[in-house]
């Protein structure tokens, strides 16, 4: 019972931590979260007092209120987001109405109007995600519209530019001659050829420089790895290899392989009485998880760390290993 209550309380604390990372701090201090924290404190106190069943009930209540707090926070944040978007859409729509956007952009204006209306109904019905979608549709509809005065000015400017361009074109056609056109073409072709040659030379230079840099990096990396490997091997020769993290079982008939004898191995634990630690970590790998006396040959066992020591690789019987700390 004590272990079960401790697990419940621990799981509750993890659960209570979730909204703190995903929600605004200002929303977290709500009625549900306050009750959740209060019940959590009661669960801990009653647990410490040895009242494990009472502690479990308080833990359950704390979890229920934590879930309600999470729902409340999500709904509040969704409402705020939707409200901001709807306000932005209404502001943009009011501006469009004042600028008589409906005359130049009747379709966009109508779409925005209907979207705001639909979004408002959804917001009033607490369908905040739907309201947010319609607010964005309204903003998108009016995103690229321009005031009527600006459109008229732009149209006049474009008309003047068009007429000027036509006049220039007629003048160029009048004074242009075939000879000038041919010379211009030759000049353009020559310029294009030289530019292509220059680009090719630059690309070749960059490629050669990049290849040289890559070769240098590869050589440096190879030298670094070789030095590290040499240092590692030298350390292994001096201190012995890092203790193994795995052990492949041989046979009982020849080698007397069992959890007791494996735990006795100096490279494992050097103590046969620690066989249960080895068994607990590997009971899912043996034919009968509740029978530690049956271990099949070729089974690869995991060797858990005993005192925080570093372990890696598969045990090799002919290798010198470092002693346990």
Curated annotation (Swiss-Prot):
Major subcellular site: membrane
Region (Disordered) residue spans: 176-224
CC per GO annotation: cell outer membrane
Lipid bilayer topology: Peripheral membrane protein
UniProt-annotated location(s): Cell outer membrane
InterPro entries according to UniProt: Bact_Kbp
ARKLEEQRIAAQKAQEERKRAEE-type repeats, residues: 167-189, 198-220
Alphabetized UniProt keyword annotations: Cell outer membrane, Membrane, Repeat, Signal
Signal peptide range in chain numbering: 1-24
EAARKAEE repeat start and end residues: 229-236
General function of this protein: Tmp may serve as a porin or transport protein for large molecules.
Protein name as catalogued: Treponemal membrane protein B
Gene: tmpB
């Amino acid at each position: 019972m004590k272990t079960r209550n401790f697990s419940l309380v621990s799981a509750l604390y993890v659960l209570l931590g979730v909204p703190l990372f995903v929600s605004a701090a200002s929303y977290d201090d709500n009625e549900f979260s306050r009750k959740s924290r209060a019940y959590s404190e009661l669960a801990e106190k009653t647990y410490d007092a040895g009242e494990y069943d009472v502690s479990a009930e308080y833990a359950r209540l704390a979890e229920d209120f934590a879930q309600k707090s999470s729902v409340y926070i999500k709904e509040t944040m969704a409402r705020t987001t939707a409200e901001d978007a709807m306000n932005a859409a209404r502001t943009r729509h009011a501006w469009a109405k004042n600028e008589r956007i409906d005359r130049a952009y009747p379709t966009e204006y109508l779409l925005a109007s209907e979207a705001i209306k639909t979004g408002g109904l959804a917001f009033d019905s607490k369908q905040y995600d739907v309201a947010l979608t319609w607010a964005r549709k309204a903003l998108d509809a009016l995103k690229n519209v321009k005031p009527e005065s600006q459109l008229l000015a732009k149209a006049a400017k474009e008309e003047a530019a068009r007429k000027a361009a036509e006049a220039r074109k007629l003048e160029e056609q009048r004074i242009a001659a075939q000879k000038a056109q041919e010379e211009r073409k030759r000049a353009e072709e020559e310029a294009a050829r030289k530019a292509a040659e220059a680009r090719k030379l630059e690309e070749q230079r960059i490629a050669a420089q990049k290849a040289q840099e890559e070769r240098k990096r590869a050589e440096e990396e190879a030298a670094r790895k070789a030095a590290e490997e040499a240092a590692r091997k030298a350390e292994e020769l001096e201190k012995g290899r890092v203790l193994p993290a795995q052990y492949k079982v041989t046979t009982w008939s020849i080698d007397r392989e069992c959890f007791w004898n494996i735990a006795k191995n100096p490279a494992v634990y050097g103590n046969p009485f620690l066989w249960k630690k080895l068994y607990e970590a590997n009971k899912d790998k043996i034919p009968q998880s509740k029978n530690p006396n049956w271990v099949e040959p070729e089974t690869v066992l995991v060797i858990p760390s005993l005192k925080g020591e570093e372990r890696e690789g598969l045990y090799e019987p002919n290798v010198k290993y470092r002693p346990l700390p």
